[in-house]
């Protein structure tokens, strides 16, 4: 009898200790989360019922909220840099030395609001040389604003398909930089991030022509132990992986496929939905695979790259091979972005050692 009571006593003590331990751990995690957000965010109300939140940004901290909103209210169509995802992006000039890219998101549904907050959670602590920095945001009952650093050379899309020719060295460097940015989102962010809309217009170019991955309006957070998510279908025709149309599920391997299309775009100088392809009822990927099947790979390379050195031609062939790996119909066969980065970086090392 005494042994039974003693056993019950020890069991009770163990259960109580276990519960208290869980509570203590939960409190520690909460304090850590609160301290982290207190350090990185500085929110204050703005006239009109809105609230501005600034992440650690010396550039944004030097601008008063009243000045920022005053400038924002003067934005017009002439300030538009582009549209896509959930909203429109404007160039916001504060003074001669301070300029931002501001993305305006029209609020209207709870689903869109959830997407907005999910985006902020994903972007708040992301700091990488190949990802566009989010300086802060403004939220109000009528609309939301995301405040980014401005990329002076615009998007890869506008640069690649514009009047200025982009040499191979620049294209290769952009490919490597974009791959590093996407790899960081996939494998180094916690939770991991699936971009869902990798395309040339979402790869921006800084003052050094370095690639910066942008537009997380369509980004989806993924817990580390998940292999896919199923929310709304998003993406851009010509870049979407074939399985996306069957399942509606966004995956990392879907992003890899989209990046493969970007590599083809860099090699061919052609848009995935070029008018010529549209007239023939096809797209860039289908055309390239047909050319490979006919063993006419030489027609793939952009005419503006003709006359490149022997070393550069070898690099183009190697990048073409990596693009085809990314475009494998079976997702499981495609390489992870970490592997894509290694393959792209190895090209320079191998070609240098050969010459």
From Swiss-Prot:
The modification Phosphoserine is found at residues 201, 230. The chain crosses the membrane at residues 9-29. GO terms for molecular function: ATP binding; protein serine kinase activity; protein serine/threonine kinase activity. The active site is at residue 197. Residues 75-347 form the Protein kinase domain. SUPFAM superfamilies: Protein kinase-like (PK-like). It is a single-pass membrane protein. Its main location: membrane. InterPro entries: Kinase-like_dom_sf, Prot_kinase_dom, Protein_kinase_ATP_BS, Ser/Thr_kinase_AS. It catalyses: L-seryl-[protein] + ATP = O-phospho-L-seryl-[protein] + ADP + H(+); L-threonyl-[protein] + ATP = O-phospho-L-threonyl-[protein] + ADP + H(+). Pfam families: Pkinase (PF00069). It is an enzyme of class 2 (transferase). Keywords: ATP-binding, Cell membrane, Kinase, Membrane, Nucleotide-binding, Phosphoprotein, Receptor, Serine/threonine-protein kinase, Transferase, Transmembrane, Transmembrane helix. This is Receptor-like serine/threonine-protein kinase At1g78530. It comes from Arabidopsis thaliana.
